[in-house]
Amino acid sequence: LLQPGDIWIMTSANRSDEPIAYKDEDAMERLRAIADAFLIHNREIAHRVDDSVLRIAAGAPRFLRRSRGYVPAPIRLAAAETEAPVVLACGAELKNTFCVTKGPLAFLSEHIGDLANQATLASYEDIIVHYEKIFTLQPRLLACDLHPDYLSTGYARQRAAREGLPLTYVQHHHAHIASVLAEHGEA
């Protein structure tokens, strides 16, 4: 296939700010104007998961984006109680991921993307349902960003009202600090 000097670039199938096209027909329809070729397989993909991005810092890999190959492996929360209620933390609007906790375990979602895109928002909601199903979780508390106009905040408000769940608002800088503490076993 390759001739000397040929360069192939292969990447996940999506345009900027759109969810990955994980069905062959969808990819060929949405991307035919920008892709030279499609490498497909007869093994069906059940769930879209974007690429992980890591960087080597101080000789060790560090996540810039924890996704394919690393999720949904949990992060152990050092300070969490075994009987703590299940919490769904809905994430921000840009570069969204969400987190579901179960006792001392935090299950981070894959990178979902920017929720302003309607298809990405629909994917976000589908992935939440998927996580709740595969981990047999039913949130007892929702947490969302303090920003009132974020679509993830709107999702949390609507779901809390619909299901009668308590809702906690979190300033996003606080959420960032908490996630770094958890990643390093300090939360």
Q: Which ranges hold each PLM region?
A:
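Acidic, glycine-enriched active-site microenvironments
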Residues: 1-187
